[in-house]
Amino acid sequence: WPCSPTPLPTSGGIHVSCLPTTLTEDMDVAVLGEGERTICELMEGFAIYGFFHKQKLHAIDGIAYRENGNLNVTRPRQFIEPLDNIPFPARELLNTSAFGNIFSSRGCPYSCTFCASTRYWNKLRFFSAEYVVAELKEMVERYGARRISFYDDLMIADKKRFEKIADLIQKEPVLAKIKFGINARANLITDHTAQVLKAMHVNSVGMGLESGNERTLRYLKGGSVSVEDNYNAVKILHRYGISANASFVIGSPDETREEILDTLHFIKTSGLNFVDTFVLVPFPGTPVWDYAKSIGAVSDDMDWNRLNIYHPKAGYPISLSKHVSPAEMNELCKKFYHARLKIAAKSAWTHPFFPAMVRAGMANVANRVRRLGAAHAI
């Protein structure tokens, strides 16, 4: 394929896939949905013509593009089945380090109000256990990974596959000293699950616990999990020596200040190792976006900077809260931030990834110094 002297202006991801009308004039093409086959077809056309030939783009499924000022959206791209047909990522093109990441599935069986995963992927699909372990081995043997995080929405969604992955990992000598991190849900964390995670060398689990208030939790997660489940998940993980990390969402439309403080209390008393808290943002493709659109808070042609809850301009970011003013929300965010810092300071020294994080940071600094020295020598 010929090399382009300038970047090819192409976009993709959940936002433009859910709202193709937001494709900006400075982008030639948007890849909608699953992108591997689509981007290959785009590049094959580019290799022939040296540019994205507008008269040929209509034959490529799963894209949006503008022609003479008009937006064209082609037929939806069919999902790749099975996912094992996808080659391993060419990680040599990336800045690899001792910290690697992997996706072993696409999609999520749940439908949280603030998350677009279910709508974007439409259904839950898995790479086979054998494929996943083969990719893990390549990451270790070829790229030197020592800590690997599963970035799936819910890696343990299929219990049998999850247990098979754990079993295969234990049979591979090259993976014997590798530590893993995964994402999970509180209602799926049982003693048996934690035992399997421990045997699989998982020492860090991230969970979207979202709230310490029952009513808010039902709004965000549809009643599939309780505050008691959240507490129990942390206790079970700690019982097996696994770090419990969590994220929370505050600022739901009908959430009161007292209910937000319930979440702060949970964070302070649950024993979590690391915490992130976010203000609810109506991202495209989510039920929250649909609600925000119904009340006129957002639109397809809005100023997208308004979705930045940390925008410095007072009153500029969109807030959906009916009971907490932007100024009050800002003060509450400071409380959560201070709680996060306190937990992080307490946990950092004992976090399973901390030694490797220090080594990776030092190696990164050393590499930067070497590059600067080489540039100066030239």
Walk through the language-model features, giving the residues of each.
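Glycine-rich beta-alpha loop elements in corrinoid/cobalamin-binding modules
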Residues: 1-79, 279-281, 285
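A structural micro-motif
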Residues: 7, 28, 69, 176-178, ...
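Catalytic cores of alpha/beta
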Residues: 20-25, 193, 254-268
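Short, well-ordered beta-strand core segments
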Residues: 30-31, 205, 275
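C-terminal accessory regions of radical SAM enzymes
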Residues: 64, 243, 258-378
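Radical SAM [4Fe-4S] cluster-binding motif and immediate context
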Residues: 84-245, 265
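Conserved strand-turn element in the central/C-terminal portion of the radical SAM core barrel
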Residues: 183-187, 212-217, 221, 234-259, ...
